[in-house]
């Protein structure tokens, strides 16, 4: 519903778009998504683009020559070049965004192709507005589905079913700029604020959410020039989407299946699990299973329930994925932020990026 509270009429994420600079990079993206349980179900009718799907999650791999995706890949390498919001009326959403300072992305539309309005978002990536979703979707027009798409979906699924949140890394001094961007165009509001200090570096983060409650975007900014946020920006050659969090209802089974398929996750020190019972009192999870699979748990505060989460290693340049299961907790793992931050920091020390002298 479009109103003063929800001026874009948002209703969740529709897709995330990925690209790479060459065929090898594109094939690596396809292999990665297959490993994550996504099925390639369709190809664009007129472009070099493919649709990967799992549950209600849509990933688009874009290798179209002479496109925004190609230009984006020249700068960033394998990367996230766009994301789409579900909205009630795409044309109305575009008009509202432009009125409030967004810059329109304009491109030529091919024959028999839908015009999907878009503006420039984080790091020059695109933010699309999509008002055809669900049973009548944009893919029905622009893509040709494979005859065995249903079988592919059933065979590949690991239990992931929606995008929980999508995190930005920005340059120092730009966190409020991008928070303001989402406030202006979509009346997003800050629901969490973090100030995390590791042993040697730190970050601050503002978690923004859309009025519909289905689009959550934490925005991270470094406190110094050596943190993992700054390293991301150097490697990515700019600001961008740091990670995509995907929801499951059975994180134990999902993670076990992903590990069996060869997915690598960020390491968590044993000492983390020694402190779980005291840090999250009354959680009722099997700590031995958490430890075996290296799943993180948080309940800050416990009265709001708990959440379980785990992070892959970086898999698209410096971009990674999060697997999350919420059991009443709508946070972002605040209690795990510091543990994870220090885990990445220890990896930076091992790689010589930080000097623990």
From Swiss-Prot:
Transmembrane segments: none annotated. The keyword Iron applies. The keyword Membrane does not apply. Fe cation binds at residues 165, 243, 322. PROSITE patterns: VOC. GO terms for molecular function: 4-hydroxyphenylpyruvate dioxygenase activity; metal ion binding; toxin activity. GO terms for biological process: symbiont-mediated cytolysis of host cell; tyrosine catabolic process. This is Hemolysin VllY. Pfam families: Glyoxalase (PF00903), Glyoxalase_5 (PF14696). Keywords: Cytolysis, Hemolysis, Iron, Metal-binding, Repeat, Toxin, Virulence. Residues 12-132, 162-313 form the VOC domain. Binds 1 Fe cation per subunit. It comes from Vibrio vulnificus (strain CMCP6). Belongs to the 4HPPD family. InterPro entries: 4OHPhenylPyrv_dOase, 4OHPhenylPyrv_dOase_C, 4OHPhenylPyrv_dOase_N, Glyas_Bleomycin-R_OHBP_Dase, Glyas_Fos-R_dOase_dom, VOC. It comes from the Bacteria. PANTHER family: 4-HYDROXYPHENYLPYRUVATE DIOXYGENASE. Its cofactor is Fe cation.
């Amino acid at each position: 519903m479009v109103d003063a509270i929800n001026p874009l009429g948002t209703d969740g994420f529709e897709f995330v778009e990925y690209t790479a600079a060459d065929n090898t990079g594109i094939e690596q993206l396809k292999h990665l998504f297959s490993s994550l349980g996504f099925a390639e179900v369709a190809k664009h009718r007129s472009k070099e683009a493919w649709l990967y799907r799992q549950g209600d999650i849509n990933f688009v791999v874009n290798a179209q020559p002479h496109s925004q995706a190609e230009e984006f890949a020249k700068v960033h390498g394998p990367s996230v070049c766009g994301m789409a919001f579900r909205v009630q009326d795409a044309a109305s959403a575009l008009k509202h965004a432009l009125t409030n300072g967004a810059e329109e992305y304009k491109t030529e539309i091919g024959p028999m192709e839908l015009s999907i309005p878009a503006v420039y978002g984080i790091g020059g990536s695109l933010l699309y507005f999509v008002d055809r979703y669900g049973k009548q979707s944009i893919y029905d027009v622009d893509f040709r589905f494979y005859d065995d798409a249903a079988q592919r979906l059933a065979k590949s699924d690991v239990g992931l079913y929606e995008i929980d949140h999508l995190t930005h890394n920005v340059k120092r001094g730009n966190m409020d700029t991008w928070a303001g961007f989402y406030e202006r165009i979509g009346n997003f509001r800050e629901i969490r604020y973090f100030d995390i200090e590791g042993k040697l570096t730190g970050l601050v983060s503002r978690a923004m959410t859309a009025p519909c409650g289905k689009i959550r975007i934490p925005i991270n900014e470094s406190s110094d020039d050596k943190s993992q946020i700054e390293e991301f920006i150097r490697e990515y050659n700019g600001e961008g989407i740091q990670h995509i969090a995907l929801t499951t209802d059975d994180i134990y089974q999902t993670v076990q299946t992903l590990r069996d398929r060869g997915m690598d996750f960020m390491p968590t020190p044993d000492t983390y699990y020694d402190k779980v019972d005291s840090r999250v009192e009354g959680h009722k999870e099997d700590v031995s299973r958490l430890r075996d699979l290296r799943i993180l748990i948080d309940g800050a505060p416990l009265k709001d329930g708990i959440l379980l989460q785990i992070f892959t290693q970086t898999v698209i340049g410096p971009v990674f994925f999060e697997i999350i299961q919420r059991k009443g907790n709508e946070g972002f793992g605040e209690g795990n932020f510091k543990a994870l931050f220090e885990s990445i920091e220890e990896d930076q020390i091992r790689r010589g990026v930080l000097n623990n002298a």
